Design a protein with these regions (language model features):
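Long, charged, glycine-rich C-terminal linkers/tails
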Residues: 25-31
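Intrinsically disordered, low-complexity regulatory regions enriched in serine/threonine/proline
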Residues: 1-10, 31-164
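Amphipathic alpha-helical segments
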Residues: 2-24
């Protein structure tokens, strides 16, 4: 699966993402910045539902929050969690082409809509667990106030995502 998937990412997904302004962080993780938000896409090839399938994950990360992993509401699997079969070169190529089509048609646009710090904080406010909003609001205020720790976290995130 890995060779077929790696080839499909290299020949199909990466050229598209590069044209959209993404940078390669690892062979399966890509990032770009929109407004002050870090947009990430990565290919999760760990399987899904006990089968050897691949998910593609998109997320918008606040510059002063965690940038590893994804959390609602600013992280999601594209195409409503669809998993693609990457077992053969043909299925991997077909799967990555479908991923590109989904990204082109609506997924990147949906990500762009929430790629604003205030908008992301507003989405967190609507979650049942109010701790998310409280925690991020405090971090946001420290970041806006140019608190040295908050700025250091943003810089560390930039380095981790190869945006520095």
């Amino acid at each position: 699966m890995a060779d077929a998937l790696t080839n499909a990412i290299t020949t199909t997904l990466w050229p598209f993402l590069k044209s959209e302004g993404f940078q390669k962080v690892t062979p399966r993780k890509f990032v770009r910045q929109r407004s002050e938000v870090f947009q990430q896409l990565w290919v999760d090839a760990n399987g899904s539902g006990g089968s050897k399938r691949t998910c593609v994950v998109l997320c918008a990360s606040l510059p002063f929050g965690p940038v590893h992993g994804y959390m609602d509401p600013h992280g999601s699997r594209i195409a409503n969690g669809r998993a693609w079969n990457m077992a053969t070169p043909e299925s991997a190529a077909n799967g990555m082409q479908q991923v590109v089509e989904v990204l082109q048609s609506h997924e990147l646009a949906k990500l762009d809509v929430i790629s604003d710090v205030e908008k992301l904080l507003g989405l967190l406010e609507n979650l049942p667990n109010r701790n998310w909003h409280s925690t991020y609001s405090q971090l946001h205020q420290r970041w806006r106030d140019k608190d040295p720790e908050a700025l250091a976290l943003e810089q560390a995130n930039r380095v981790a995502l190869k945006l520095a």
